[in-house]
């Protein structure tokens, strides 16, 4: 085409474009604005500004955008913030997280990184509470005892060491695990002895450890109840709230209707009849004796170690007793193993050094039995070892401690003619409650519940002479059973 013709065609098209723009000016402007808005929207969704989008790509030598790590602190909970550094909530220390190294804000010389707790939850966390070292999750070097406890000498055994009192400072050596920020088990040092203590019994702040729990004035109710009958005062017991155990694979019936069976072979041989009968009623659980004083359920190896006499007089073999409990569980019933705690003549025969004694040092026969002292930790270890063996060997869902007390009827001996083997200077009620804490800790680790049988009297507004006090016991165990006997309601009106 000749040059003149091309110029004429170009001029014609330019004239047409100018005419189109004059006629559609607003439409063109709106279209351009929409395109700009779309570009900005895409940038916001992508988490970057237009300036960031045009930034050069990150090289391998630059800091990566994300790092894996853990929440660390001296406290159980750590705050996280909005981008404006307003507090938005808390997370438990020990949580595994991911944080962005190039999205942070700074205030007062402290940098806060955008931290992801899950796919959807995030917030800004102080650099002081982020670590890539799992051993650095727990920052405290000392803890203070809030609830008096005996240190465990070994994390994997039942042996107990020194009793550490409220407010005692313990040096932290290491720790194992956290649950909602609370340490499962500290390894600590105290007066040259190394041991272990649960994080639920200590505080990182001495003032908090020494404080008495009194929310809603609860403690004040007990503080005025002194030592009326020799069992101790209510003020010295522990009322700090404990979370009751709950196991996904072991549901406690609610309500629980149980039938009780002794461990006599003449009873257990008819287990099929009892199961068939239970199916016709509301019964959903069986209570079976592991031991009842000198009536021994089966020849557990625990008896061989702690009480050979009990082993010798076992009513059933392991296999015979095991078959009974298995039938109960196969039929869909909840299985509760009952054992007498501080009523045990066989043990006192084997270990008179741990028995409650008279003034001359001989084992004291009270209420048709000899009684191991509830003050003696070796007795605690024995009974909890037996309970754990019953859980592991027989498959019980719950352990029920009966005779979980000192003998009643000892008033005549209290004036210097009785030796309770009280090496720690505790009250009766303190030793009973502390035993149950120890038992619950170890049996909960085994995945079962713990219950206690008590006299109905212990619900009165005083600590009983034999060391039972309902509020202190019920604060620890998962279930509590008062024992109202039929003869309490006799026509004579004696009760």
What is each of the regions a protein language model found here?
Residues 92-126, 165-200:
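SH3/SH3-like beta-barrel superfamily modules
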Residues 81-93, 153-166:
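SH3/SH3-like (including bacterial SH3b) beta-barrel domains
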Residues 247-266, 323, 337-389:
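Active-site-adjacent "subsite" loops/lids of carbohydrate-active enzymes
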Residues 334-344, 400-407, 428-465:
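Aromatic-lined carbohydrate-recognition surfaces of secreted/lumenal glycan-active proteins
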Residues 449-489:
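Substrate-binding cleft/loops of secretory-pathway carbohydrate-active enzymes
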Residues 56-66, 116-143, 189-244:
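Boundary regions of SH3-family modules and the immediately adjacent low-complexity/disordered segments
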Residues 281-316, 408-415:
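Aromatic-lined carbohydrate-binding/catalytic grooves of carbohydrate-active enzymes
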Residues 271-296, 391-398, 479:
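Catalytic domains of carbohydrate-active enzymes, especially glycoside hydrolases
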């Amino acid at each position: 085409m000749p040059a003149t013709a091309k110029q004429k065609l170009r001029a014609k098209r330019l004239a047409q474009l100018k005419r189109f723009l004059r006629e559609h000016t607003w439409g063109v402007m709106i279209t351009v604005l929409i395109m700009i808005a779309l570009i900005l929207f895409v940038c916001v969704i992508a988490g970057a500004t237009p300036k960031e989008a045009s930034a050069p790509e990150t090289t391998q030598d630059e800091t990566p955008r994300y790092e894996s790590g853990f929440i660390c602190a001296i406290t159980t909970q750590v705050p996280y913030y909005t981008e404006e550094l307003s507090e938005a909530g808390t997370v438990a220390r020990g949580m595994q997280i991911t944080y962005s190294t190039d999205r942070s804000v700074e205030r007062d010389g402290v940098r806060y990184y955008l931290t992801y707790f899950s796919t959807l939850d995030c917030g800004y966390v102080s650099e002081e509470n982020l670590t890539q070292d799992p051993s650095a999750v727990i920052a405290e070097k000392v803890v203070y005892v809030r609830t008096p406890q005996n240190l465990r000498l070994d994390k994997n055994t039942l042996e107990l060491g020194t009793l550490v009192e409220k407010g005692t400072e313990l040096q932290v050596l290491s720790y194992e695990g956290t649950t909602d920020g609370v340490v499962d088990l500290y390894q600590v040092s105290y007066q040259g002895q190394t041991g272990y203590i649960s994080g639920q019994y200590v505080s990182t702040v001495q003032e908090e450890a020494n404080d008495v729990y009194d929310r809603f004035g609860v403690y004040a109710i007990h503080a005025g109840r002194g030592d009326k009958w020799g069992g101790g005062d209510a003020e010295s017991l522990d009322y700090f709230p404990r979370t009751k155990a709950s196991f996904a694979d072991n549901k406690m019936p609610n309500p629980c209707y149980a039938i009780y069976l002794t461990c006599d072979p003449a009873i257990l041989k008819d287990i099929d009849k009892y199961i068939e009968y239970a199916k016709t009623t509301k019964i959903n659980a069986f209570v079976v004796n592991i031991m009842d004083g000198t009536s021994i359920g089966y020849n557990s190896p625990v008896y061989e170690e702690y009480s050979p006499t009990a082993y010798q007089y076992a009513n059933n073999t392991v296999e015979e007793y095991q078959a009974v409990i298995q039938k109960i569980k196969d039929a869909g019933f909840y299985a509760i193993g009952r054992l007498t705690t501080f009523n045990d003549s066989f043990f006192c025969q084997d270990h008179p050094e741990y028995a409650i004694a008279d003034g001359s040092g001989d084992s004291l026969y009270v209420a048709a039995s000899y009684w191991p002292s509830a003050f003696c930790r070796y007795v605690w270890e024995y009974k909890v070892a037996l309970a754990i063996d019953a859980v592991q060997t027989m498959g019980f869902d719950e352990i029920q401690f009966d005779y979980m007390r000192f003998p009643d009827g000892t008033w005549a001996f209290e004036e210097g003619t009785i030796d309770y083997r009280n090496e720690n200077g505790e009250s009766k009620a303190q030793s009973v409650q502390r035993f149950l804490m120890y038992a619950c800790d170890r049996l909960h680790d085994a995945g079962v519940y713990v219950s206690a049988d008590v006299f109905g009297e212990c619900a009165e507004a005083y600590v009983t002479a034999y060391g039972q006090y309902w509020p202190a016991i019920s604060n620890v165990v998962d279930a509590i059973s008062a024992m109202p006997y039929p003869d309490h309601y006799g026509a004579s009106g004696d009760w």
